[in-house]
């Protein structure tokens, strides 16, 4: 679950059209949210208030080992009008979960409209007590695609009483780059992420299929600690797409660290509107050690607003949501009825005489090869019908994916249960998060096997209450 300050930071990014999914550090965010979720420790109470559209404050109190707490303030030069308190906020926005990766062509329009936020900034500070530990963060937008991020920590128990990390980030639709410097070990780093694929919509959709819902990203990071002369290197690959028949998204990642010999692959899929499954396989090709991690999250619908999202929608599969998604093609075709050319089946098109057609290595929908069919007058009508069929197929695919995403966004969930296990670590984590009255509550437990007695034991247990208005 996001803290209120983290939630406001995400609202700031959304208001200024900053795409977090295009940053290398978030390339495995979906699988990490399902497999590596944290368990609360002890008792924690978080009370927050947004006094104006530009400022907010937060007070946190916990009893882990001893009574301690913190006081935080946040200021944004951009009005955060799209924020809500814990009573009204949807769980999809308040909880860390599966991320639907948007194609770069879709993000291009959003980023191009952020010029009015070129000089926006966000200031954040937190003071911990008892003690004198401080933390601060500054986000300064330099241009529509570039920002400066500074994080500072002051703690008397740290070397030189603290540390500072500076990020210079450039986030463009097709790529992102980061230059990083940390005073700890004089660490210098560079990260980059590139999105592959052609976002040009001017291509002939009748001859070349569209994959607007698929995103392929390749990134790498380089590190060098000048004080200890230690290098670091890792690279990662991410493939995110959506099913053209149901609109359900999935994400696959592959990360490699050649210096440490570590390889990690993940597969995360949203199996339904209310459920997500994720798996991860880790392998070290130096020690041949391996580990398999499995996890899932399952949302529970609110009793006040049960699954009514499908009641007024014309949707015979395994669930109501699938019945809706399976009838998108019928709905789209109904919108074109009467005003378009009658569409014949692909079988009837294939029965046409193709003896006069010119062969070319571009295959059309009727399994024949064509080259510039407009030059063939007797095939002009056939071409129009094929193009119309391709247009309807593409529109149907877009409507299905959009419909599924709308169902996820509009569903009223009351709680979520997360489960994660690791075979090699021999542990189980269970987390429940939901709304109780006006509070957001998070409670969970981590159970592992004692390596000496080989008996199960509770490693961590806690409950957290969060209130914001």
Swiss-Prot record:
The keyword Endoplasmic reticulum does not apply. Keywords: Membrane, Mitochondrion, Mitochondrion outer membrane, Transmembrane, Transmembrane beta strand. It is found in: Mitochondrion outer membrane. InterPro entries: Mdm10. It is a multi-pass membrane protein. GO terms for cellular component: ERMES complex; SAM complex. Its main location: mitochondrion. GO terms for biological process: establishment of mitochondrion localization; mitochondrial genome maintenance; mitochondrial outer membrane translocase complex assembly; mitochondrion-endoplasmic reticulum membrane tethering; phospholipid transport; protein insertion into mitochondrial outer membrane. It holds the Pfam family MDM10. Belongs to the MDM10 family. Component of the ER-mitochondria encounter structure (ERMES) or MDM complex, composed of MMM1, MDM10, MDM12 and MDM34. Associates with the mitochondrial outer membrane sorting assembly machinery SAM(core) complex. PANTHER family: MITOCHONDRIAL DISTRIBUTION AND MORPHOLOGY PROTEIN 10. Component of the ERMES/MDM complex, which serves as a molecular tether to connect the endoplasmic reticulum and mitochondria. Components of this complex are involved in the control of mitochondrial shape and protein biogenesis and may function in phospholipid exchange. MDM10 is involved in the late assembly steps of the general translocase of the mitochondrial outer membrane (TOM complex). Functions in the TOM40-specific route of the assembly of outer membrane beta-barrel proteins, including the association of TOM40 with the receptor TOM22 and small TOM proteins. Lacks alpha-helical transmembrane segments, suggesting that it resides in the membrane via beta-sheet conformations similar to those predicted for other outer membrane proteins and porin. This is Mitochondrial distribution and morphology protein 10. The gene is MDM10.
């Amino acid at each position: 679950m996001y803290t209120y300050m983290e939630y406001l930071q995400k609202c700031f990014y959304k208001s200024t059209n900053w795409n977090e999914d295009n940053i290398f550090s978030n390339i495995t965010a979906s699988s990490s949210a399902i497999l590596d979720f944290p368990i609360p420790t002890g008792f924690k109470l978080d009370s927050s208030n947004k006094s104006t559209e530009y400022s907010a404050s937060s007070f946190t109190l916990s009893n882990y080992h001893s009574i301690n707490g913190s006081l935080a303030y946040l200021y944004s030069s951009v009005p955060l009008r799209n924020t809500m308190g814990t009573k009204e906020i949807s769980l999809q926005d308040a909880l860390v979960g599966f991320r639907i990766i948007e194609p770069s062509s879709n993000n291009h329009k959003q980023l191009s409209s952020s010029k009015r936020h070129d000089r926006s900034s966000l200031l954040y500070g937190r003071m911990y007590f008892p003690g004198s530990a401080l933390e601060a963060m500054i986000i300064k937008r330099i241009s529509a695609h570039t920002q400066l991020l500074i994080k500072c920590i002051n703690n008397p128990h740290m070397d030189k009483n603290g540390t500072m990390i500076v990020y210079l980030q450039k986030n463009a639709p097709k790529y992102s780059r980061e230059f990083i410097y940390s005073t700890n070990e004089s660490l210098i780093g560079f990260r980059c992420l590139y999105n592959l694929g052609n976002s040009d919509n001017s291509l002939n959709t009748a001859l070349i299929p569209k994959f607007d819902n698929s995103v392929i990203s390749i990134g790498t990071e380089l590190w060098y600690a000048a004080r200890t002369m230690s290098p670091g290197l890792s690279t990662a690959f991410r493939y995110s797409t959506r099913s053209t028949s149901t609109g359900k998204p999935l994400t696959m990642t592959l990360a490699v660290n050649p210096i440490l010999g570590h390889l990690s692959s993940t597969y995360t899929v949203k199996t339904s509107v209310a459920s997500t499954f994720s798996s991860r396989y880790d392998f070290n090709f130096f020690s041949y050690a391996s580990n398999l991690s499995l996890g899932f999250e399952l949302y529970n619908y609110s009793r006040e607003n049960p699954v009514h999202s499908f009641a007024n929608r014309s949707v015979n599969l395994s669930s109501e949501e699938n019945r809706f998604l399976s009838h998108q093609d019928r709905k789209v075709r109904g919108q074109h009825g009467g005003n378009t050319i009658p569409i014949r089946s692909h079988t009837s098109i294939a029965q046409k005489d193709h003896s006069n057609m010119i062969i070319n290595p571009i295959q059309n929908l009727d399994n024949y090869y064509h080259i510039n069919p407009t030059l063939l007058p007797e095939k002009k009508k056939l071409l129009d019908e094929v193009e119309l069929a391709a247009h309807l197929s593409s529109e149907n695919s877009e409507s299905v994916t959009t419909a599924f995403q709308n169902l996820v966004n509009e569903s009223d969930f009351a709680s979520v249960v997360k489960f994660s296990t690791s075979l090699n670590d021999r542990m189980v984590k269970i987390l429940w998060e939901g709304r109780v009255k006006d509070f957001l509550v998070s409670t969970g437990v981590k159970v592992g096997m004692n390596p000496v007695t080989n008996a199960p034991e509770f490693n961590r247990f806690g409950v957290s209450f969060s209130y914001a208005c």
